[in-house]
Amino acid sequence: MEIVRTIAEADCAARALPRPLGLVPTMGALHDGHLALVARARATCASVMATIFVNPLQFGPNEDFAKYPRAFPEDARRLEAAGVDLLFAPSVAEMYPTGFDTTVDPGAVGTRYEGALRPGHFRGVATVCAKLFAIAGAERA
């Protein structure tokens, strides 16, 4: 499994993989549900790319981004054992450089369900997913 940290590296590595490419975005702290998604991608795609990125945009002001569990070495080992070909694990600065201000507005759903209790949560999720999908260029997710 190749591990990359920059958008340029991820773009280059993903383009080189056999198609179709399946993308499994995560924030790490992997559980069996994540691994089931990897297994599904492995069964239906020629290549699998996973991401580990704890996205600060989906945490509200009273939520503790800093305390979100991070176990990169163990998560990477589990993803490799599950058959992931490429792991993209960028820094916050890589995903949201100084001056970044483009976000995805999820519309009304952003204020319903979990969004009613966590303002901005769905905007953060939609933004990071759009960025990860664009970087990966995957056919399936």
Write out the residue ranges for each language-model feature.
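Nucleotidyltransferase catalytic core that binds NTPs
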Residues: 1-141
